[in-house]
Amino acid sequence: FALAHMVNDFDIMKSYLDEGANGIETDITFSPEGEPESAFHGVPCDCKRWCDRTVSFDSYLQKTSDLSTPGHPDYRENLLIIILDLKLNGLSQDALANGGRRLADKLAAHFWTVGRRDQRATFVVSVPQTSQKVFMKTFREGMEAIGMGDMNAKVGFDFTDNGDVSVTKAVYDELGITEHIWASDGITNCVALLFRGTSRLEELIQKRDEGESTYISKVYAWTYDKETSVVLALELGVDGVMTNYADFVISILNKPEHSSKYRLATYEDDPFERFKAV
């Protein structure tokens, strides 16, 4: 997956989809009460990016629903996965709980109501810290409560705190989440990968490959903008690369030395199916 980073308005969304990105990551802000409000990152953000792009969350959902619905004039077949990078830090536990329910309500309203279930996008609900696990809990409960439990097939989960892998697994076990788990490791593009290292990324890939007992479906790295970093990630066996330059990542993927082992995912590929590194 070539995952376009910080896709927070429609102009940049079009640009990345034109480049061939098959996934987008969007920052979602919340009110103090836990109501999803807008796609917005703000400063600071990645180097060489405009931090203040924004649209309302409802407008964002309507647009991405149109883009992922076959037969709609705006349909884009390469939009496969939408990572919702949820800006939850600072919210109380009550607000987190409300936020999970409200996100379920909004996704259902825009994507899975009667007559709209043919849309093709899959979501990753990306929570910053394991201490905010109640958000995932109430999201899943909310989906069941509104009769959308079957649509959990289109939803995955991710914690982005670069935390201890065993602790993260214990939290998923507590939540009863045993599949559809995307695991990520990364750092802003303003810091060289040399300083971050890849030891945790390699640990995630190893856990993914351990067998049927593992809890990880996919592993992605962020935010990789340099060829050396992208090549290293591919050689390690990641499932996705999040980047500010989707066309650049795709061009690397298409080089002969990589295209014999990897290709860009399509709709026929299950975003939650586990593939081992070779």
UniProtKB/Swiss-Prot annotation:
InterPro entries: PLC-like_Pdiesterase_TIM-brl (IPR017946)
Enzyme class: lyase
Residues holding Mg(2+): E25, D27, D85
Disulfide bridge map: C45-C51, C47-C190
Localization, UniProt: Secreted
Tissue expression pattern: Expressed by the venom gland.
A single Gene Ontology CC term: extracellular region
Top-level lineage group: Eukaryota
An annotated Gene Ontology molecular function: phosphoric diester hydrolase activity
Reaction catalyzed: an N-(acyl)-sphingosylphosphocholine = an N-(acyl)-sphingosyl-1,3-cyclic phosphate + choline; an N-(acyl)-sphingosylphosphoethanolamine = an N-(acyl)-sphingosyl-1,3-cyclic phosphate + ethanolamine; a 1-acyl-sn-glycero-3-phosphocholine = a 1-acyl-sn-glycero-2,3-cyclic phosphate + choline; a 1-acyl-sn-glycero-3-phosphoethanolamine = a 1-acyl-sn-glycero-2,3-cyclic phosphate + ethanolamine
Statement: the UniProt record of this protein carries the keyword Aminoacyl-tRNA synthetase: no
Keyword Disulfide bond belongs to the record: yes
GO terms classed as biological process: killing of cells of another organism; lipid catabolic process
Record's keyword terms, sorted: Cytolysis, Dermonecrotic toxin, Disulfide bond, Hemolysis, Lipid degradation, Lipid metabolism, Lyase, Magnesium, Metal-binding, Secreted, Toxin
Annotated active site: H5, H41 (nucleophile)
EC id: 4.6.1.-
Cofactor binding remark: Binds 1 Mg(2+) ion per subunit.
Cofactor: Mg(2+)
Record's function text: Dermonecrotic toxins cleave the phosphodiester linkage between the phosphate and headgroup of certain phospholipids (sphingolipid and lysolipid substrates), forming an alcohol (often choline) and a cyclic phosphate. This toxin acts on sphingomyelin (SM). It may also act on ceramide phosphoethanolamine (CPE), lysophosphatidylcholine (LPC) and lysophosphatidylethanolamine (LPE), but not on lysophosphatidylserine (LPS), and lysophosphatidylglycerol (LPG). It acts by transphosphatidylation, releasing exclusively cyclic phosphate products as second products.
Family the entry assigns: Belongs to the arthropod phospholipase D family. Class II subfamily.
Protein name (database record): Dermonecrotic toxin LspiSicTox-betaIE2iii
Protein source organism: Loxosceles spinulosa
